[in-house]
Amino acid sequence: DLILGAGVSSKFFLACRPPGHHAFPSMGSGFCIFNNAALGAKYAREKFGIKRIAIVDFDAHHGNGTQEIFYGDSNVFYMSFHQHPHYPGTGGPDETGCGKGEGFNLNLPFMPGTEEPDYMVSLIDIILPLLERFEPGLIIVSAGYDSHLSDSMSSLGLVEGSYWKIMLALSIFCRWACNGRMGIVLEGGYDCGSTADSAVNTISACLEDSTIMKIKNIDDMENYFKVDNDYRKNRVRNRLMLDELRKNFNLN
């Protein structure tokens, strides 16, 4: 309501517990009872008539509940970075939607030990081009900080500044595509210190107005984050998987 109705803000951060992305329409799972991101997307569509919504999930675990809810829906594009293999065992790169929703579900299953470079290359080479093609009216971010190096719930290697970069990239895209409108909901994060610091970095990135206004396209963003061919070749662990996803989603 604050974003789409009253226009009080273009972004919000919902610091909620329990998390939600493992919850299904008829049952909870994986510490989750209600699927906060899915409820927000459905509410935005039904009350405000937002036709297309993207959900970007960077929790360490695949959001199996969110994926199932929208798997056959061409108006909600679910995109998930997560460790694989890991709980709940879903989220393979071949899970791309069904029926009308085919091609509107993207999974980026990262091997244990994956660090920031894979996330940044995935954003610039895959997620942002797909978002440009999709033209969402709202982006909802499932912000899970259990992908932090200090969190014992995964073997991923992000740090506080990684979330700042991810969220800055998404904030820049939101300005281009959907009048800056973005909702962020807290998912996992079980190391209290790193979760708190990562959330602060998330919010800080959303407030970087001068940088957000300065970057005009994906090429500018690539230069700003210094993601060049050498970076792609020498610092990315999941390069073969990302190359296959580019091919499958016609991004080559």
Regions found by a protein language model. Name each.
Residues D1-N252:
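A general "terminal functional-core" signal
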